[in-house]
């Protein structure tokens, strides 16, 4: 385990020495702030106009039409390719992968260490969202905090799944740009496959299984479904195994 932590630490240091990690954090904070203020402004306007605003927790955070967590989910896949494109591609292009293989570190430790670095970065993104969720818990009366924690868990699993896919794509090529584009194409397809050919029952069942982001919807509604939880874990393990043995 110590070797895995060392690889993860080195990867995080490399990531934060580059402007990409900081740029993503800045853009992410700006986007989440914009989405949160938009959702909050809408509810405040409704209250000023005399409309009833029941279930503020759902209205601000878990509303499919403008809720913060739903909107964040729709954009998460855009950030991951920039984070994962250099995980293995950088080592392959520079030749440093040979040094890693010649060191007393196994291939499994290298892959798991690099994936662990993405898990840590995913935790950072969730903490950023958690700031706004925490603010909501302070200002909303009788807030459904268990609901919000479940929703954050769903987003966290979604990011970790995206990261596993990105790591696999990065291991296929020594060109970071190619890895980023490939990851973006796959994640885009997996995000929008759920809206394709929905009038055909057989195809609808298939696209349901391929839609990764759709699996986090139950979490955003406050439900932890064993089927969805197992689905995320299987996809993560599948792509990690493909990276290791592919």
Where do the language-model regions lie?
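Alpha-helical transmembrane segments of multipass membrane proteins
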Residues: 11, 131-135, 164-168, 188, ...
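Transmembrane helix boundary and interhelical loop/hinge segments in multi-pass membrane proteins
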Residues: 82-101, 115
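Alpha-helix N-cap/helix-start motif at helix boundaries, enriched for small hydrophobics
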Residues: 108-112
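Terminal transmembrane helical anchor/hairpin motif
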Residues: 38-63, 172, 179-246
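Transmembrane alpha-helical core residues of multi-pass small-molecule transporters
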Residues: 27-31, 117, 183-190
């Amino acid at each position: 385990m110590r070797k895995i932590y060392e690889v993860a630490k080195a990867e995080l240091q490399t990531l934060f020495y580059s402007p990409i990690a900081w740029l993503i954090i800045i853009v992410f904070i700006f986007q989440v702030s914009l989405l949160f203020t938009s959702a909050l402004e809408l509810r405040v306007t409704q209250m000023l106009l005399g409309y009833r605003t029941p279930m503020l927790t759902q209205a601000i955070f878990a509303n499919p039409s403008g809720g913060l967590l739903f909107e964040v989910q729709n954009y998460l896949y855009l950030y991951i390719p920039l984070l994962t494109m250099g995980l293995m591609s950088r080592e392959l292009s520079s030749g440093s992968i040979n040094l890693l293989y010649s060191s007393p570190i196994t291939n499994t430790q290298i892959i798991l260490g690099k994936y662990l670095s993405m898990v840590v970065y995913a935790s950072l993104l969730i903490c950023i969202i958690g700031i706004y969720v925490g603010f909501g818990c302070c200002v909303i009366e009788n807030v459904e905090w268990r609901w919000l924690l479940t929703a954050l868990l769903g987003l966290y699993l979604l990011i970790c799944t995206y990261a596993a896919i990105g790591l696999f794509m990065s291991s296929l090529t020594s060109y970071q740009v190619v890895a980023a584009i490939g990851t973006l194409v796959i994640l885009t397809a997996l995000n929008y496959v759920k809206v394709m050919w929905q009038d055909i029952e057989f195809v609808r069942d298939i696209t349901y299984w391929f839609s990764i982001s759709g699996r986090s919807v139950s979490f955003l509604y406050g439900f932890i479904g064993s089927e969805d939880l197992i689905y995320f874990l299987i996809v993560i393990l599948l792509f990690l195994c493909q990276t290791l043995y592919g």
